[in-house]
Amino acid sequence: MPYTTMGRLLFLLALAPPFAAPAAPTPDDGVTRNLTLAMPAKPITSRAELNAYLRDTPPANSPLNWLTPGAQRRFLDSLVYREHGLGGMSLADLRYELTRKQVYTLLRLFGAQDYAVDLDALTTPRPATHDDTAGTLEAAYDRLLAAAEHAEGGAQGQAISRSYAAEFAPAQTDARRHALGDRDAEFLFRAAELAFRATGQPGYLADLRRDFAELERRHRVDRPHASDFHDALLVAHRDDEARALLAAYPVVERSPPPSMRSFSRIRNGQPSLWVVTPGTRKRELVRFRFNIRAPAQVIVLASTACHFSANAARDIEADPLLRDLFREYGQWVAPPSEVTAFDAVREWNEAHPALRLGIAYDNAALPMVERVETPVFYFLDHGTVVDTVVGWPPGGNLDAIRRGLRKIDLLR
């Protein structure tokens, strides 16, 4: 959908000058050869250019060849091309199979190398003896991703749960887990992480915890595994455990987790938000009730990682009337996963004091949200959605915002 961000859309940065780097040695006949990587003179900006590169480049000369066949296919399938070039991609497989240096080189193919700088990628290259053979769970993982991609709206979580129950839950026993090969053990961990991220269900976190312990037993934990487990613990509000994990795995480059406190009784299932304590530098989130049944209000699903959300906030703040209406009747809310982005949320609130951003405690805080896209404006009358405005195009969306405000009698 144009002008919205789903998850983390990656928009490309500047092109670094081309260079030649040695490929991995190939001692097939007793001679080590340094093959020069084939790097295009300019970034690949279309599917046609990518197809030409793949056609004309021997696999051994391409950094794409550093990926296992399945990872390469998933990465290339994730590339989204826009009018002016590449507009989005998934870095999941790159994180789990390559180091930052390798990711940087590979992303130079597309002019997107800057995204490797702080990526939670491997700290050391996979050993040459690493078994790249696809196990039984890699195909199951592909089907899990397909279930997530093809599900409509609020059915995504259900589709993921069904796929996970059929193909991964049977492997979540100690005996089955121990019997898996290393790659399948990693895919089991990644599947549990995806299911927990999509649904927030505690059963998936329990699976993830056991899978992480299995990877520890095999001495297979590196930065991507520890980073994903850390973030899952924070989303599950286990800040003490996340803090302990950081101490055990300093390769996880995160700031200390905020303390999470609740000073009022909030019953299970009641909508609530995490709020950054204003006027203090304490790393603390406080949980408050969130009344979605107020007579008239605007709930804005936004993200600190979405420049469309920032543009919307800028344009609304530039209009004195809208700024005051949103200050009194608006609530900007980030998805539950942004509990991992404490510093970014605090910076947003300092930059937009009239449009302060809270973090949804869980999915129940925003029952009207079927699929996480940002920004989305929900105009509510006593909890009923009367109008919805999706996205923030280059020309803004202020007219649509005014129409929505009129429908809930906040603007004449």
Where are these regions (language model features)?
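Non-globular targeting/processing and membrane-anchoring segments
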Residues: 24-290, 404-412
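Thiol-based oxidoreductase modules, predominantly thioredoxin-like and allied folds used
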Residues: 325-345, 351-364
